[in-house]
A protein has these predicted regions:
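Charge-rich, low-complexity terminal tails
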Residues: 2, 47, 166, 215, ...
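Interfacial aromatic "cap" segments that immediately flank transmembrane helices
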Residues: 2-36, 98-121, 139-187, 231
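Short alpha-helical linear motifs
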Residues: 34, 49-53, 183-187, 198-199, ...
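Selective recognition of hydrophobic, aromatic-rich stretches within alpha-helical transmembrane segments
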Residues: 60-92, 122-155, 194-226
Length: 231
């Protein structure tokens, strides 16, 4: 089995173009939750720069209610991610502007999985101080990201996906390397041109939408192949 990179990428982009109205609809509530954090984002970026520069004698303070804003942002992120996956897997009739807003168990499960995978990726890097370790760990656990789709559509988590090496590599390429590389290159260009942080943020949002839809398409191909193999 091969996970067709070109076809999957093009199918994801075509899906976004065809369903842009529904995508905007399911983005309204999540954007409301994310908006407070976006307002203080420039201040948070300034604080992060001060932390990296380690300026002595300079007091560092974060904006009020930052923790609350982060929690609201995380809720909106999980809500939008779930609805994107449901839109791809179950069709337009499965989502609406209020879809999953009150399904706190599902959102908590999705958030917990996000934090678990994030910790598994960041912790080894924090211990070693080597960035490439993060990529190695992410490569090893990237099949677990397919469980985000399982959570979205109400299926049980699967810890053993049994992917072939080629499929594993292609999934890592589409879900990690390509989005990261594109965001990194655009960040360099944005800094060189002096573009606003909100322009960079807009590109990050576009990458998020594409990655979410692309993950669901990868899931469909992998699950369909595994089901055919089990017959």
């Amino acid at each position: 089995m091969m996970l067709p990179i070109k076809k999957t990428i093009l199918a994801s982009l075509a899906f976004i173009i065809m369903h842009w109205r529904k995508i905007i609809e399911i983005s309204i509530i999540p954007m409301i939750f994310a908006f407070p954090l976006l307002l203080v984002l420039p201040e948070l970026m300034a604080v992060s720069k001060q932390l990296f520069m380690v300026q002595t004698g300079v007091s560092i303070s974060v904006p009020d209610n930052t923790l609350l804003y982060m929690l609201l942002f995380l809720f909106g992120y999980a809500l939008l991610s779930i609805n994107l996956a449901r839109l791809v897997m179950l069709g337009t009739g499965s989502v609406s502007i209020l879809s999953c807003v009150f399904e706190f168990g599902k959102i908590a499960k999705y958030t917990g999985l996000t934090m678990l995978i994030g910790f598994a990726i960041v912790f080894p890097t924090a211990l070693t101080g080597l960035l490439f370790v993060q990529l190695i760990v992410y490569f090893l656990i990237v099949p677990l990201t397919l469980n985000f789709v399982n959570v979205a559509i109400g299926r049980a988590l699967n810890l053993r996906w049994r992917l072939t090496f080629i499929v594993h590599v292609n999934l890592f390429l589409m879900q990690v390397l390509l989005p990261t590389l594109f965001a990194y290159l655009f960040g360099i260009v944005a800094d060189a041109l002096g573009l606003s942080i909100y322009v960079t943020l807009l590109v990050q949002v576009i990458i998020f939408y594409w990655s979410g839809v692309n993950l669901a398409f990868c899931y469909r191909v992998i699950v369909a192949h595994n089901s055919a193999q089990s017959l």
